[in-house]
Structures are given as structure tokens and as C-alpha cells.
Amino acid sequence: PFQRLGVGSLGGKGRGLAFFFTKMNELGLQDEYPEVEIGVPRTLVLATGRFTHFIESNQLSEIVLSDATDEELSQAFLNGKFADEDLIVMRQMLDLIDWPLAVRSSSLLEDALHQPFAGVYSTFMLPNDHPDLEVRITQLGQAIKLVYASTFYSKAKAYVAATPNSIEEERMAVVIQEVVGANHGESFYPTIAGVARSHNHYPVGSIEPEDGLAAIALGLGRSVAEGEKCIRVSPSHPKRIHQFAN
């Protein structure tokens, strides 16, 4: 369920997913919670070598370091062409999967310990349900190109400039991943999504910092990621739900 295409790095997100995937059996989670299916969704990572090839083969090296607007960058990348091997893999993947997909950035600098780059680059959600395979391939290709382009958007350049890193050194891998969830009427989403932390910096009552904290919400968890309203609870004390103003 975890595959890579190309040489180079998997990027921050890709490395984390690969590490978790290889450690799944060692953790013994399935034995401890047999009634719950725990796993990593089917994933394909386009390594940074494919990004470099796309930039070079489409002669984009000059515009990415220019003062071009985000719109101009997006159009330049959308006009680019993929290598045949990339298109073959996309076709093979979508021939097997007609399930919603997340096309996620996974740059070299992303998910670093002290400079996480959260929300700096683009992610796209694709319904991937069009009856015409060619349309789905086109939509996937456009999403990948726009993730590539977001490496050089003004927001990303400004963020990188505030760090010891250089935009010239940045490389982008792309994670293509099945979305976990189910159909609910005309919508598709998981029952819950969230973020778990091993340390709770604001314990209440008898809850200890080491008990951790989970922030969860209905659906894909966007409200969690963007700091909006959600439920925060310690997994060790699931019935004690202490909510704060934010």
C-alpha cells in the first residue's frame, strides 16, 4: 500500500508516512485493539527527483526564481508536460482506484522539528469519481503541478526567507493518498479526524501532562488543523471533556 516513484527524497510528510508504515507491525496496535482497523491508506509518493525532472524538462528554472505572481507560476506549471513514466503510473493508479484522493505537498523542509512549514504549501482533494479515466488523469496531473508550483508562491518564498534555508535548495515531493471515509448523502468524509499529542501543556484537574491530548472533529479535520472549534480530550480520561473558549 506504500509505493514511491523516482529517485531522491520522499520529503517531510512522505518520510513520516514511510516510517509509520514500516513500524506498524512492530507497534502491535492491531493486537491491542483487534476491533479497530489501523493502517496507512494506500499511498504513492512522487520523490523529489520527479519534481527536479519536471522543472528542468519544462524549462521552468528561470521563472520559479523570478518575481512572477502566483497566478503566472500556476499557469506556467499547468502548461508543463509530465514524463511518460509519470503518466503511466498515474494511469495505473487511477485504473485501480476510483476513491477520493488527497494530493499533498511533501517538501524537503516540511515537518521539520523546529520549522514545520505547516500550511505553507498546497494540498488538493480530488473526488476522483468521473466516469472518464482520462478526465481523472488530467485532474490528478493538474493537482500535482499546482503542488509543485506552490513551492515558489510568494507565501512560501517569504516563509523560507525568514529561516536559515534558501528557496533554491527547496525540493518538492508529492504524496498521493486515498482519503479515509465513507459516503454520507452527497458528501464524503470520515466520522472523525484529529491530531493527537503525547504531552498536554494545559492539564486540568487530575489529568497529567503525560496523559496526552487529542483534538478531534467531525469529518476531515480541517477545523482542527486551522485552530477552529473542536473537541479536546485526554485519551486517558475520555469522559472528562474540558473545553476552553478557543
Residue locations for each model-derived region?
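Conserved mixed alpha/beta core segments that line enzyme active sites in large multi-domain catalysts
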Residues: 1-32, 80-246
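A conserved helix-loop-beta module that forms one wall/lid of the active-site cleft
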Residues: 1-66, 70-81
